[in-house]
A protein has these predicted regions:
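Outer-membrane beta-barrel initiation region
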Residues: 8-240, 244, 297-307
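Short flexible/disordered coil segments
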Residues: 112-127, 254-266, 272, 314-324
Length: 332
């Protein structure tokens, strides 16, 4: 490369080195009490939240959660970079497990000597050659250090939204400007309650009158009634979820509640995702009942059972994931 331009593209969220990292290394080398708490403090400061850690011989194993980086590869890299700065020299291998909803996503085993050597030269591709990626089943009993998390934990935000109806004999466009309150309550590990509540600020639905005369079950065709009668305070989502990772490559979910604006449901899903393969297979089944038009807690008479088989295929060259689904949908 004869160009004067730096071949590494700068990131907007660049890594900030830890101040006095040499002093932190000395303290971390005294005993595991300081080693674990150093990892907890400095990872948490970078929004990489340590869930568990253990040192065995020359290996430091950590499990972390995060929602800051969209790239899980970058997040794991930031964990490795942080640990490399603050861990004593006796640690030769990092075993880093990414965790989501108390389920293991993947584990990266990193040879520290190779990582440190190539990282300093910005040879990231060479550094990655000595990283082993494996499927993971997050097991708390494997770890010596497990910082206590105080539950429940509540995340929420208020944001604007627009509901739209485009095309039709009543007019080309009808819209509803709304305020939405979104909430996620972590009741405990693996158990969450999702909720979305909204209310109208301004709409022009008064002239929207088009009704459906379909002979098929009205699972979606009553959209006009939902738009008009749900203009005031409506519960768009109120769903309890339980996630599990019973074995490597296998993930499960059980859900119940007001699963969307038109239907309540109870059911579950299973996803088989072989770690080193480019495909995944999912099965889901739900008992669904149609909600009232006001979108509160009432229901209509229509109910059905849905079941889907899903196949996911990832094409690595163009980074495209194809989804094929078949089964019984809401209308049969």
């Amino acid at each position: 490369n004869f160009s004067k331009k730096e071949p590494i593209t700068p990131k907007k969220d660049q890594y900030v080195p830890i101040k006095d990292s040499d002093a932190v290394r000395i303290v971390s080398d005294r005993e595991n009490f300081y080693l674990y708490r150093s990892a907890l403090y400095f990872l948490n400061n970078k929004e990489l939240f340590l869930q568990a850690a253990t040192q065995k011989d020359e290996t430091l194993a950590v499990a972390y959660m995060q929602n800051h980086h969209t790239s899980s590869v970058r997040a794991t890299g930031r964990v490795a970079q942080t640990l490399d700065e603050i861990m004593p020299d006796k640690i030769k291998t990092f075993e880093i497990t990414s965790v989501n909803a108390a389920m293991g996503m993947h584990t990266a085993k990193i040879d520290r000597t190779s990582y440190s050597k190539y990282k300093s030269l910005n040879y990231y591709k060479l550094a990655s050659q000595n990283i082993e990626l494996e499927p993971s089943k997050y097991a708390k009993e494997y770890y010596e250090f497990q910082p206590q998390t105080k539950y429940p934990i509540h995340f929420w935000k208020i944001t604007p939204d627009i509901r739209s109806q485009i095309g039709g004999p009543d007019g080309f466009y009808f819209g509803d400007i709304r305020l939405i309150f979104k909430s996620e309550l972590l009741i405990r590990k693996k158990l969450t309650l999702l909720s979305t509540i909204s209310t109208s600020v301004y709409d022009n639905f008064e002239d929207l009158k088009l009704l459906s005369d379909s002979v098929l079950p009205h699972v979606r065709t009553d959209i006009v009634e939902y738009l008009k009668e749900g203009r005031e305070l409506s519960i768009d989502l109120l769903q309890l979820n339980y996630f599990d990772n019973p074995s490597k490559n296998l993930y499960t979910k059980v859900a119940a509640g007001l699963c969307e604006s038109m239907f309540g449901c109870v059911g579950g899903e299973i996803l088989y995702r072989p770690f080193h393969k480019n495909y995944a297979i999912g099965i889901e089944a739900y008992r669904a009942k149609q909600r009232e038009y006001k979108q509160r807690f009432g229901f209509r008479d229509y109910e059905t059972t849905t079941g889907l088989l899903s196949t996911y295929l990832y094409e690595p060259k163009y980074q495209v994931t194809t989804l094929l689904q078949g089964g019984k949908f809401l209308a049969g």
